[in-house]
Amino acid sequence: MQNISPKVQNQINMLQQMQQQMQTILSQKSQYELAAQEARRAVEELKETDDSAAVYMNVGTVVMQKPKSEVISKVTEKIETLEIRIRSIEKQEKMLQEKFEKLQSQVRSEIEGRKTPDAN
């Protein structure tokens, strides 16, 4: 590691930062996917519920009784919003992965390029 140029050391630091960003992105994606899955289950349960049944929904810090159709509509909107966020995160993930792989390849080339003259 002592023979590594400052440029390569900087690139290695950038790779580490990208890994941390990727972990953050994957964590967010996982949270959104879980929330979307829970919301889909809620919609399925609501659809199976009798139309005359009391349905409650969080409105800020208050739980209020709402018409079943309104709750289904609100939860469906939430699912759509979460799916948009998931797709956006997947795009970020793909772009970051491509940048990571490109930079990783450059670092490998630099390191292997430095090792080759020493072997001769």
UniProtKB/Swiss-Prot annotation:
One Pfam match: Prefoldin_2
Subcellular location per the Swiss-Prot or TrEMBL entry: Cytoplasm
Record GO terms (molecular function): unfolded protein binding
Cellular component annotations (GO), alphabetically ordered: cytoplasm; prefoldin complex
Highest rank taxon of the organism: Archaea
Single GO BP term: protein folding
Keywords recorded for this protein, A-Z: Chaperone, Cytoplasm
Keyword Chaperone on entry: yes
Protein family according to the UniProt entry: Belongs to the prefoldin subunit beta family.
NCBIfam families in alphabetical order: gimC_beta (TIGR02338)
Subunit structure as annotated in this protein's UniProt entry: Heterohexamer of two alpha and four beta subunits.
Function in brief: Molecular chaperone capable of stabilizing a range of proteins. Seems to fulfill an ATP-independent, HSP70-like function in archaeal de novo protein folding.
Protein name: Prefoldin subunit beta
Organism: Methanospirillum hungatei JF-1 (strain ATCC 27890 / DSM 864 / NBRC 100397 / JF-1)
